[in-house]
């Protein structure tokens, strides 16, 4: 299966609290997802959870990635995900400042 890319400009302000990225439909036949988040100015670590759904209504957690306040990007590879829809849940926790600027994805 050829690679498929998606770039999402998030511009999520941590000060606004917990958030979700929009739903993303997985390309047909894709089972592996690589996600890289770009961010800046975090004053505490932030948690991002990949969720999956077959009906785009009921989402379940698959994997969690930590956005380390001392870095500016974080990448996770999730293998063997058989689903139609995904979304990302962002939990700011103790963080009050910073921005998540981009979410870059590769599917295969």
Q: How would you describe each model-predicted region?
A:
Residues 21-25, 73-80:
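Exposed aromatic-hydrophobic patches
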Residues 51-53:
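Conserved Ser/Thr-centered positions that define the repeating blades of beta-propeller domains
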């Amino acid at each position: 299966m050829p690679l498929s890319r998606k770039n999402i400009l998030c511009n999520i302000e941590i000060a606004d609290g917990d958030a979700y990225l929009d739903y993303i439909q997985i390309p047909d036949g894709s089972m592996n997802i690589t996600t890289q988040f770009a961010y800046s100015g975090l004053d505490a670590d932030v948690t991002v959870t990949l969720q999956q759904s077959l009906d785009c209504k009921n989402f379940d957690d698959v994997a969690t990635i930590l956005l380390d306040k001392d870095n500016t990007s974080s990448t996770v590879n999730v293998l063997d995900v058989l689903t139609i829809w995904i979304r990302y849940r962002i939990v700011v926790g103790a963080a009050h400042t910073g921005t998540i600027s981009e979410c870059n994805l590769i599917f295969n």
